[in-house]
Amino acid sequence: MAETFSSLQDLKSATAAPTQEAPHYVQKLDAQGRAYATGKRKDAVARVWIKPGSGKVVVNGRAVEVYFARPVLRMILQQPLGVAKRVDQYDLTVTVAGGGLSGQAGAVRHGLSKALVAFEPELRGVLKKEGFLTRDSRVVERKKYGKKKARRSFQFSKR
């Protein structure tokens, strides 16, 4: 049987799909009210805890200015907070191991981004658009036998 509709509004309401609510994300906090996440980059692994505060950053028990002396590394570290407009709103406690300073800074950035999303799930879209939630999978290529390095061959002599 064909239904009869007296107006366009009736037709619209009959054919409209049921609206779905946006998924509701929940904060993931520990007993001290901190969000935790792990970040990785090259060989470095960073464990990051964040809690609301004044913007104090402690890396391996030292101030961030001492541990990451180069300003570029500190800038990499602060990028997620800058994009999310949350500079000086969170205290960070970080333990990082493995790799060099550049890889460690990248690992902290990755972990901080994930911890921010755990604390404020609505920041996920902003941080994902900037690429901070994506693990940078580039690692050092292994050395092959018969070669000097991963790709460089030994010097060749014709005679």
Curated annotation (Swiss-Prot):
Gene3D superfamilies: 3.30.230.10. GO terms for biological process: translation. Keywords: Ribonucleoprotein, Ribosomal protein. InterPro entries: Ribosomal_Su5_D2-typ_SF, Ribosomal_uS9, Ribosomal_uS9_bac/plastid, Ribosomal_uS9_CS, Ribsml_uS5_D2-typ_fold_subgr. One of its GO terms (molecular function) is structural constituent of ribosome. Pfam families: Ribosomal_S9. Disulfide bonds: none annotated. One of its GO terms (cellular component) is cytosolic small ribosomal subunit. Belongs to the universal ribosomal protein uS9 family. This is Small ribosomal subunit protein uS9. It comes from Methylocella silvestris (strain DSM 15510 / CIP 108128 / LMG 27833 / NCIMB 13906 / BL2).
